[in-house]
Amino acid sequence: MRIILIGFMGVGKTTIGKIIAKKLKLNFVDMDNYIEKREGKSISKIFEEYGEQHFRELESESLKDLIKSDNIVISTGGGIVTTKQNLEILKKEKIVIFLDGNTQTILNHLSKEIDKRPLLSKSNNVENTISNLLNERYEKYNSICDIKIDINEKNIEEVVSQILVNIG
């Protein structure tokens, strides 16, 4: 079994992924952490030194590596859907779960870590930036998911429970 979590930054992919993996006795990999370990640099540093395009290439390479694994829960980065190559890979997967949160929920979740998010840290209007990026990506998330879970006004346990029911 391979479960892939997608959705915007701050929707809880990593937190929820770890819990799902533990409950199902699967391995867990957070793609951003995987990239940081592989590159020996933080995501922020990679963005700063090489730009977003380079990071997206690293993300694609990492996705290709990770989907070779079985018995795993993979938490992707929020921008995984920005490249056509990744969309094609993810469309072929059997269990892609879209954690769907609105702008306000995402803003609430990210409020303490905006400086760690390269696409938000330099923004003059974080709420607007989140809204715009979410609008750009929403249809892509929606088009490749097998299961969509609305996370708005739900606690982690409710989201986990909904996922477990949906994957049977």
Ranges and model annotations:
Residues 14:
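Walker A/P-loop
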Residues 29, 95-97, 147-149:
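Hydrophobic/aromatic beta-strand patches that form the interior of the parallel beta-sheet core
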Residues 19, 23, 107-108, 125, ...:
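NTP-dependent small-molecule kinase module
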